[in-house]
């Protein structure tokens, strides 16, 4: 089950063809839709409608289950057209958005006083190994990474998404963020699909982590969804900014 299939534009179009069907009628027509797919026959209009409504109801049901079980949403978004530079740092280090994601996950675990696992969707073994290498370097070779390993178990688990329901739920949430969640004041202002924003945006807002973080000696509000305009740009701390300001020569006046 993929979010891109469950909530594609056709499903919304089919669901809106007729009034909402009673549960039993919808189930009957959904079975007809799936059976005709196996038989290579064309479904009739009520079957398309039932299948579309069933897909949307399933997505809503997943979000309801996540809320009932106190799930918390974490996501790091980057612009679609970002290209990875050909540099040693890009090859060997975690991207900035990945570090920010771990940061927020750490704040949540620290708040809950619980250890947390990293469960990944297995994609391609060579790329997965490269990611593990970057992750190990972060947790072993950086002071921040070693500190955060107090709550984050620094060894990820890889699973097949088609056999793991939580990964499928995460995929649905990611798809809804991609198309229906924006942070315009922070530069995350790409066009949305209105039907996703209106139907599932409130679920994302409810599930998003909210807590407190700390950096450079200060405490600030932290949220589970973060937008990173350039995931390969070097991060500059407040201390470094202050040192840079002090090192500048005074401006001469005329």
Would you name each region that the model predicts?
Residues 1-254:
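Phosphate-ester processing/binding pockets and catalytic centers
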């Amino acid at each position: 089950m993929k979010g891109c299939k469950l909530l594609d534009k056709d499903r919304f179009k089919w669901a809106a063809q007729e009034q909402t069907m009673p549960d039993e009628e919808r189930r009957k027509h959904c079975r007809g839709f799936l059976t005709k797919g196996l038989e290579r026959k064309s479904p009739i209009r009520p079957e398309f409608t039932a299948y579309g409504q069933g897909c949307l109801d399933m997505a809503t049901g997943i979000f309801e289950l996540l809320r009932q079980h106190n799930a918390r949403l974490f996501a790091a978004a980057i612009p679609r057209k970002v290209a990875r530079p050909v540099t040693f740092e890009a090859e060997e280090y975690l991207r900035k958005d990945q570090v920010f994601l771990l940061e927020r996950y750490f704040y949540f675990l620290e708040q809950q006083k619980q250890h947390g696992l990293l469960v990944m969707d297995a994609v391609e073994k060579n790329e997965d190994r490269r990611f593990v290498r970057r992750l190990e370097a972060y947790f072993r070779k950086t002071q921040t990474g070693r500190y955060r390993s107090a709550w984050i178990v620094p060894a990820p688990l890889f699973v097949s998404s088609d056999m793991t329901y939580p990964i499928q739920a995460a995929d649905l949430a990611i798809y809804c963020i991609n198309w229906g969640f924006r942070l315009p004041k922070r530069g995350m202002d790409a066009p949305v699909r209105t039907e996703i924003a209106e139907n599932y945006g409130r679920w994302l807002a409810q599930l998003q982590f909210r807590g407190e973080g700390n950096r450079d000696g200060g405490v600030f509000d932290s949220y589970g969804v973060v937008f990173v305009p350039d995931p390969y740009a070097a991060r500059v701390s407040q201390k470094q900014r202050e040192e840079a300001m002090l090192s500048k020569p005074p401006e001469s006046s005329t």
